[in-house]
């Protein structure tokens, strides 16, 4: 349990007593296990995007790798809500399409050779760099993705 008014840093317990104002009703379409995981993905995404990247500002170019996973999807939603230009990578065209429906500006398939050049072509004129990469996928993102970063900008894993 964590991220509440009285336990902001988090604690681990089998039972906990909370004020009713600290609770939210789980969405009816989620199982108990799915609902329990939602704060974990959200908090991880929040820390990666807002705390570590330092780029939660309108117009910033954000690359979210491995789109389709819970944390990556939450970062996409947070960044889009901040009016960032969100770009995604995935090995699945279906996941890229879904990410665009959720607010991504564009996406690349990391299985394709030269994906980083394709991404560079998608970036807005006058801002041909990525301000931050939030990576949950690994692979060649470190090698290829960091070339897209403006010098001294954050890479959050």
Positions of PLM-derived features:
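Hydrophobic alpha-helical segments typical of transmembrane helices
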Residues: 11-12, 22, 44, 75, ...
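Glycine-rich phosphate/adenylate-binding loop and adjacent beta-alpha elements
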Residues: 1-25, 38
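Glycine/charged-rich beta-loop-alpha catalytic/anionic-binding loops adjacent to active sites
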Residues: 22-33, 60
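Glycine-rich cofactor phosphate-binding loops and adjacent beta1-alpha1 units
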Residues: 56-57, 87, 97, 101-102, ...
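Mid-domain Rossmann-like dinucleotide-binding core that forms the NAD(H)/NADP(H) cofactor-binding site
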Residues: 35-113
């Amino acid at each position: 349990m964590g991220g509440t008014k009285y336990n902001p840093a988090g604690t681990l317990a089998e039972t906990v007593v909370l004020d009713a104002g600290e609770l939210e009703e789980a969405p009816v379409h989620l199982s108990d296990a799915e609902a329990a995981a939602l704060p974990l993905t959200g908090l991880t995404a929040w820390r990666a995007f807002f705390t570590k990247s330092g780029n939660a500002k309108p117009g910033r170019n954000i690359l979210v790798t491995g789109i389709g996973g819970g944390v990556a999807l939450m970062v996409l939603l947070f960044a889009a809500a901040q009016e960032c230009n969100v770009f995604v990578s995935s090995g699945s065209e279906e996941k890229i399409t879904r990410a665009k429906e959720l607010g991504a500006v564009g996406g690349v398939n990391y299985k394709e050779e030269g994906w980083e050049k394709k991404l560079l072509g998608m970036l807005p004129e006058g801002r041909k760099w990525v301000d931050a990469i939030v990576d949950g996928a690994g692979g060649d993102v470190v090698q290829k993705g960091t070339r897209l970063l403006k010098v001294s900008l954050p890479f959050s894993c």
